[in-house]
């Protein structure tokens, strides 16, 4: 019984993770000046943030602001990477597509707001 549940959680992580990355890549296409790369496997995902579309300029300030704003909206993220410009997403294994949509919506809303500045 426990093994079966574990297998379902692993399957869920793969299915939802693939969906989540696909949705995040749609956001990346809309905001290439902010997002250089989406990477990860399963539900362990990273979003590399940059300054003005320049791959050699990591955007630590934007990453920190994004995690702090999203924390106020109930989304817990962290930063990683040598420049702390990578948004690290590590949700629980029970994370589902609705949760992914919510996180994507919050990230997109944040970037829309930043883009207006």
PLM feature spans:
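Conserved N-terminal phosphate-binding loop of PLP-dependent enzymes in the Aspartate aminotransferase
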Residues: 1-117
